[in-house]
Amino acid sequence: MKIIIYIFFFYSIYPLAFAGKYDCIIATKKYELIYNLPKNLLISVSLVESGKKIKDGDFISWPWTINMGGKGKFFDNKEKALEYTNNFIFKGKKNIDIGCMQINYMY
């Protein structure tokens, strides 16, 4: 299970600048297959943790989601999410949930 957490943490800081509409869904489906997890388990978790209604009306999980102290924020791209997150990390804050699956930075 730890490997799944690490995989999703690294996916949360995925090197693309802009998130694609289905990036989180693609990643969750991939790792459900690799680890023989129940179908749609990770997709369900990601929708609950980082779900966002987008312009075309779809409800998707969003990779550039940051949550601190129960206040979730959705960013347009990686750079904005990292800038926001790094400001708090430099101040010593570590209890920050990041990305599709909202993996906690502290752990």
How would you label these PLM feature ranges?
Residues 3-16:
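Sec-dependent N-terminal signal peptides
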Residues 18-107:
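Catalytic glycan-binding domains that act on GlcNAc-containing polysaccharides
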